[in-house]
Design a protein with these regions (language model features):
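Transmembrane alpha-helices and adjacent helix-loop boundaries
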Residues: 1-163
Length: 163
């Protein structure tokens, strides 16, 4: 084993690790936001936006990440949109992760018992208050295991970004 070679490339490994962590953390934060918005649009059936969110989730979950990244990196410049590699990786992982997060949040929102919502209505809470104080805290607690699994999934998928 050539220890001098390992010692010479070690800084590159640390640099690559930091880049991977940056891409993963930014993508996870953005994916959680995208997922939450999409799950609310789907769960509460906001007219046209509901269909757009469903289309986005189906498209993202049913195409491989590598194909999505190829489209972003090679396809968008053909349309006149220039994106650097880092931004392409973040957008691609966010696009993929947002759909999985949306399904995790949707499951959490659907699992809140109707009796909880009826009780909140009976004490005079407004719909936004019901969502903020009754539905969202319970849905978030239920969704945390799936969100954690999706975060790990995105960290693992960040290896594809290097391709």
């Amino acid at each position: 084993m050539n220890w001098q070679y390992i010692h010479s490339v070690l800084p590159q490994f640390f640099s690559a690790t930091l880049t991977t962590l940056k891409i993963s953390i930014i993508s996870i934060i953005l994916a959680i936001l995208v997922g939450l918005i999409c799950s609310i649009l789907i769960t509460y059936r906001v007219r046209v936006l509901n269909r757009i969110a469903q289309f986005y989730i189906e498209l993202s979950r049913n195409t491989p990440l590598l194909i999505q990244l190829f489209f972003l990196y090679y396809g968008l410049p053909k349309l006149g949109i220039k994106i650097d590699g880092f931004a392409c990786g973040v957008i691609g992982l966010t696009f993929l992760g947002g759909s999985y997060m949306a399904e995790a949040f949707r499951a959490g929102l659907k699992s809140v018992a109707q009796g909880q919502i009826d009780s909140a209505k009976s004490i005079g809470l407004q719909p936004t208050q019901i969502f903020r104080y009754v539905i969202f805290p319970q849905a978030l607690a239920i969704s945390i295991p799936a969100i954690g699994a999706n975060c790990l999934f995105l960290i693992k998928e960040s290896s594809v970004v290097s391709a």
